Amino acid sequence: MSVFTFGHGSNGALGLGKITDDTCPTPQKVNYFTEIDKRVKKVACGSYHTVFVTDDEHLYICGIKKDPKHGTTLFYTSPPPTTTTTTTTTSSTSATTTTTNGMVNEKNNNNKNNNGEKIVNSKPESVIIKDGASNTTNDSTSSSSTSTSSLSSSLPPTNIETPRDKKKPPIKLDKGIPHHRSTRELIQRPESPLLNKLLTSKAEMEFKHYESNEKSKDEMKDNENENEEDEDDDDDDSTIRQNEDKESSLIDDNESETSLRINKKDAENITNNIRLIKELDEQQQQPQQPQQNLKGIMNQPPLPTNDDLDEDPNIHFTPIRISTHFLENSPLNTIKQVALGNYHIVLLTEGGNVWTWGSNSNGQLGYLVDTQQQQQQQLQQQQSMSSLQPSASSSSPSSSSLQTTCTPKMVEIKCVKYIATGVKNTAALTEWGELYMWGINEHGELGLGDTIDRRTPTRVIRLKNEVVSTIACSSTHSACYTESGKMYVWGQSDETGKIQAIPSPLPIHSYLDREIKSPNGGGVGGFFGGGGKIKQLACGQRCIAVLTQMGEVFMWEIPGIPIPLRNALENHSVRNIVMGNFHLVCLTDSGEVVTIGRNKTGQLGRTDAENEPGIVKQLSFDPDGLNSDEFVVSIAAGEFHSVALVENTPKTKLALQLVRMQRNYLRQLNILNNIYYKSMMSMASPYDPVVLSMMNNGSASTLPPSLKGLSGGLPDNANNTIKNGKDKDNHHNGDSNGHHSNGHYHGNGNNGNNSITTSNSISSPSLLGSGGTLKSRSASIATIRGLFGINHMLHHSQSQSFQEENSTVTEDEIKEIFSDIEALSKLTEKFLSYLDQRMDNWDPVSKVLGDIFLDEALMAAYRIYIPYSDSYNTSCMTLFNIRRRNERLSNIIKDCEKKSKSFGVKLDQEFVKEIDLKSLLLSPLQNIPRIYILLRELGSDDSGNINPRDIDLINFAATKFQVLLERMNQNFQFVNAVEILHCSSNEYGNPQIMGGSLPQLVDKLTHHNISDPNFRDVFLLTFRAFTTPCNLFDLLVETFQRQKHLKNGRVVNVITSWVVHHFYDFEKDKLSDFTQDPNHNPQLLSEKLEQFIYSEDHQSVSQIKLQYFSHRKRLESSINLIDNQKLTQNEITTPPPLQIQNNNQNNNLENNNNNNNNNNTTTTTTTPNDNINDINNNNNNNNNNNNNNNNNNNNNNNNNNNNNNNNNLTNSTIKLVVQPPIPINFNLLDSQPIEVAQTLTIMDHHYFAMIDKREFLGQRWAKNKSPNIQISTDHFNRTSQVVVTEILKSKNSKQRSATLGYFISVAYCCFELNNLSGTASIIYGLNSASIQRLKKSWSKLPKESMIAFEYLDKIVTPMKNYISLRHLMTTIQPPCVPFLGTYLKDLTFIEEGNPSIIGGLINFYKQRKIAEVIFQIQQHQQVVYSAIRSNPTIKAFLMSSHTFDDKQAQKISSEAE
């Protein structure tokens, strides 16, 4: 673990040592802890200091040594030890051995221990001088940094030792405990005559022998020891406290010596005089160090030794270890949290105890100082300074300002769970949610109703009825948040200094989820806050920031309103925030640091001169940043500097990933609850049995006459039933909808046997909506009768209103869809709060994580996932049904999808692919397997960083989640329960596989418990994008060998379906020759299949054999049929390139598409007449078409339809027919518009149905490898050119206006025939530049025709990605000719916008989306127009008439007008 600091460094708070510049604008590593081999687990920042807590519970501080105003310091020392040891003199030399005393302690405390640590550590001891007389104990009552002197030597025969020296031998020092330098080294200095004289004569004169009884000695001893109970021991053994009150005598049993008790006052005087003389002597011999010795007298904290000679003596530029012996006897004494003010420190332990020390000028330490004791210490300090030189005394603070530095003392408050500090105030939050505050109250920042300082913890009475969950303080104000969701603010409330001394509520939640308007003030909504509970508060100089549990940060100045920092944070989800005076530091869930605010001293960690927010690159995954296995786990901010803690343990990384995952999941639930549920409930109606009965049982008879017979051109008795509610079988029971009226046949109807049912459909069910085109589209223009019903369009709004009344959605239905979502949200909030609390006080070595998952209340709450999985399918089906019958609800859901994209922090793309409603409803089912997988990873960590007990707990928790997962999987029957992670959901609530490796996908394909009914069809259609047919066949054979004993026949069914619906893999055809696919090797695949058939005796293989040879026989028959055909001189050859006519009389036959087939087919020049003949032949065999559709309905896999309608290049024979010539005087305008529309519709559908499904794969249309798509496109463009030519052929504007009206009428008839392609081709012709410029002609157009044109133009406009046309195409009912351009655009977007491989797995989601588009196309290809006829003459004219190109058209148009 590493520590990085940046910002203002001249005060030493960065801990980097002496730096050249005052600021450090980029993060720098604190190498001190690496050198001493210590791991930092917590950091905290104050105004001028930084605190580090290591994993062995040692405390380190760097920064300014003392408060310049009050002389206090955070580098506390208990009164220094005054121990002396035996001194021996000989005749020649005097060898003296002495421990640290008041004089030497200053230098000795700055020593480094064996680890190289700088320490400030001392403990008061009693001084015992043994001289055959009574003993004396000299204790220190001062808690300041002043070192009380002791006797450093005595007369030659006198032995000086500590009581512990007598009791036990010296204890070997621990590596982490600092040791003292030898006092012999300190005392062996150049001879000083003045000092030697004092040591020999002064002691003889001042010491007296006292003789008293044993009782008197014991009483004096007890009184002195009472003051020693709270003082720390400074012996080499740091774990032993002085407790010598039980000693009644210190007389050595082996020696008959009399202890001498020193008079306390005399001893202090002697000590002071000795020290002063020694200091003066040293100044004479070592003049280069007078300042250091002088400051030792002036109550300065001891200075650590520093290798840098230029270091400021008033600043610790590198961390100094502070003794924590005061915690040894406290229960649960592990440090939980540290907080700092200007010059005071607050420490919270796991046991809920609070310790403070430092400046207590305004009572911020939380306890009263003993005034008598303080005055006595100040008097002693003044006496010791009175004999100093004027130059030395002038540099010390005045006696009135002297204030002792308090040693750590426990505050009288218990069960504290959280602490916070301002500059000179402190707050503590107890386990019961009670808030206590103390310290300065100048601005009312204590919230006690006045501005009087408090020196002891005082409860905030205003919040006595609230359970406070978090608190934050600054120099002028404070803020808190309660469990009830209320936020309170108090203190200085504006820039003028107005004071709010009582906590006042702030309606924070009214701002957290509100809409943020655009900056231009136009009232257009920009984005929405994500809402949620507040997790953390941070206060700066007149600023407040809040972090929600959703990971969103809001900040505002006082006074002001909360504003989300989404743009500043670049949509990062935030886990932790801290604030300095004028800057905010955010730690994201992904482990990156984002800083916002002022950057004057480099506190943002970036070299940018501007104050723009951004990521700190050195602490991110940038190439110039951290290593790949490192991440930031904790942050802290001081007044003008910042600190980041970096870790690389796998356990921590997995734990943070769990937090990130659960926060993202909570945002998903939040979107479901606050957007979808609330929006849908706003339009729902209370449950009404009467209305619901009418809605479910409604029929055409309940509709008003204005909505009966909606299709233009049909008589009133037409049997066009509008499907309502849940009438799922309505389209099966009706008669044939094709009716003859005035010689015209309308194409809205279709034989009931030809309709595609929901149960057999593989495409999106939205195509089969019961409202369909006959409902929504006809309600828009249904009253248009050809060209003459345009004025009835005004009834549309009335019809729509009635329609909505009969499609009411009840509140119970909405509640059924979102059942248990609210309970899941509360459970996730609780679980996430546990994780956040654990991670905020995290230590991967000592902390346990598994107990959270085994919490009984939490595990009991997780049972909610079982009923949710049970009702998931029902919820999805309810949603599907109400969307079918209520168009308004569908629009609301679309609006919710748009709002979801800008609601709160953006969802993590690693866990979320789609944010539509059905995907969000699936997210709870995917949450449990994610937790299970992560627990397994945590339990298998063998790095040695995890507590063994925690591993056992985690593995046990994983077992429980596995049982829960298997129970949930009973509703879906996945091969492996975690497969649901790679699934998406369709409208029916069936999870669908989204990705996996090829073996995994093949296992899913052949598993007997497959839960995705469309998986096989999607796979067989698209597998060529990620593997070859031969490779797939090998995998299937291998799987078959493994599953032989199961006798489930799954592999055989897959191969059989492959042969039946994709036989082109086993034989060559013209399309494969045209595309020249290198992976297409039908000969090798056929050999493998035949070998497999003949080598296996399994009975189920006969099914494959039957289908395979049946298809081969059909191909041979088609070859013989082609070879037997004789061409005559009167026959006109051939159709366009690769346009092969579907032979309806032999619809079960297939062409042999080997290379030999090309030699047997006569090829000549293409003519348009051949196309006309082919289409005419298609329409002269309606009975055969109906038979084909009957076969389609009998096939459960409609999308492939035995290749009769979709594989025209492979399943057809060439049919050459004589084409009648076009009459010489034929005029298209003489034909009825409906007749032209019918003919055009049949032609458009033919070209559309000719397109092979393989042409839609791999963007072949953009590579000139899709001939049928090109033919259909050319036909579309030719139709537009025919419209342009016919209009420009008119002689004057009046005729041109009439021609315009004629084609508008044809377009309307095409629209009512569901021919969207024909409608678009005509409208695009009318919108061409050469036609639009004919202003005179357009001005003479009748008003009704102009209204109709504008209406159709809005439908087929490409604006907003063909939004109107797409809406019709998703609700229309076959037969239909859709607009091909929208499908090609969708396929291009899917191909280019989705990678084929994600994380080493095949992105099957991409293949599924491609297949969905193709299945929609196939549905419209399969259902033909069997109830209308085409006119051969019109057909020939549309195919072969002369047309103008663009240049000719523009020239003629310019000449006309």
From Swiss-Prot:
RCC1 repeats lie at residues 1-55, 351-401, 432-483, 485-549, 590-647. Keywords: Coiled coil, Guanine-nucleotide releasing factor, Repeat. Residues 225-237 have a biased composition (Acidic residues). Residues 75-196, 209-264, 282-313, 376-404, 703-762, 1127-1210 are annotated as: Disordered. Residues 171-188, 209-224, 238-249, 724-738 have a biased composition (Basic and acidic residues). One of its GO terms (molecular function) is guanyl-nucleotide exchange factor activity. It comes from the Eukaryota. Residues 1232-1454 form the Ras-GEF domain. GO terms for cellular component: plasma membrane. Residues 83-121, 134-158, 283-292, 376-403, 703-715, 739-762, 1142-1210 have a biased composition (Low complexity). Residues 989-1109 form the N-terminal Ras-GEF domain. Promotes the exchange of Ras-bound GDP by GTP. This is Ras guanine nucleotide exchange factor C. It comes from Dictyostelium discoideum. The gene is gefC.
